[in-house]
Amino acid sequence: MRTLETDRLIIRAFVLEDAGTVSRLLDAAFGAGAHGSADEKRVMFEYAVAADAGHALLHQPPYGDRAIVKRDSNELIGSVGFAPCLMPFGQLASFERTTRFTSEIGLFWALFPEHWGHGYATEAAAAMIAYGFSQLRLRRIVATTEHDNTRSIKVMRRLGMRLERNPTSEPEWFQTVGILDNTE
């Protein structure tokens, strides 16, 4: 996937030198140690960087994390990306004609807390959506979060996503789903 640029951001592939920053981002977003020790996170990150490069050589979809970097300072402030999602979308009203588990393209984002509230998540996610719809010709993009993650829900709304609530309590991270259809 090519590097994307917005007025304030650069969205680029991660490089090995980003490993320490990504480890801190994972701790900030999910809690210290949630993704293993520092060494385990480094090994996982090195694999992800190599896998992304390999998939690009094979012209595969650009799944995985991309660095969100501020243009004015070159500071890495977060991550955004696409992920294949095989989830129980059939539980949702607008997916009622599908089987319980369907494959969708998921969009995710995470920022260091000190960069919340400045519109960076919305700006980065909007750039990914534009790329996904115009270049990859995706039919639909989804995002998921917990009911109490009001910041992510606000980002979904700003992106124009239709929000649906999972009528069941499982899985816990699949409580609020943002859905955006490609209308082009």
Predicted stretch roles:
Residues 110, 123, 151:
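Short alpha-helical segment within the catalytic ATP-binding CA
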Residues 156:
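Conserved active-site tyrosine of GNAT-family acetyltransferases
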Residues 86, 143-153:
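Conserved beta-strand-loop-alpha-helix junction that forms the acyl-donor binding cleft
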Residues 159:
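Structured interaction and signal-relay segments at domain junctions
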Residues 117-122:
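Glycine-rich acyl-CoA binding loop
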Residues 1-114, 127-131, 135, 162-184:
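GNAT-family acyltransferases
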Residues 135-144:
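Conserved GNAT acetyl-CoA-binding A-motif
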